[in-house]
Swiss-Prot record:
Swiss-Prot/TrEMBL keywords: Disulfide bond, Protease inhibitor, Secreted, Serine protease inhibitor
Protein name: Subtilisin inhibitor-like protein 12
PROSITE patterns associated with the record: SSI
Disulfide pattern: 31-46, 69-99
UniProt GO cellular component terms: extracellular region
Pfam families: SSI
Length: 111
């Protein structure tokens, strides 16, 4: 292959961490050579991942300015497992609730 592999399985689940979260949805995302997968917006998600060099921890997970969410604790955990530019990656992030997840300015976990 001309390109190192960049393929991920992304999940969204109810729970405080990946080990205990009940997975609600899962999609695939492959970014090389062209964006594909079951993710609803693969081109946009791959562009965001390319912008941070595949370092999922650098994606902005805070709410966009002006977005209001309640402080209720109903944790939503997102995960990414797979390979980016030929390197194995494993990522998880927990949002306080679904509003905070949806308020984050990233499409990677919008599915």
């Amino acid at each position: 292959s001309l390109y190192p592999a960049s393929a991920l399985v992304l999940t969204v689940g109810h729970g405080a961490d990946a080990a205990t979260a009940e997975v609600q949805r899962a999609v695939t995302l492959s970014c090389r050579p062209t964006p594909t997968g079951t993710h609803p917006a693969p081109a946009q998600a791959c562009a965001e991942l390319h912008s941070v060099g595949g370092a999922l921890g650098l994606l902005r997970t805070g709410a966009e300015p002006g977005r209001m969410c309640t402080k209720e604790w109903r944790p939503i955990t997102v995960t990414a497992e797979g390979v980016w530019d030929g390197r194995r990656v494993s990522y998880e992030h927990t949002f306080a609730n679904n509003c905070f997840k949806n308020a984050a300015p990233t499409t990677v976990f919008e599915f």
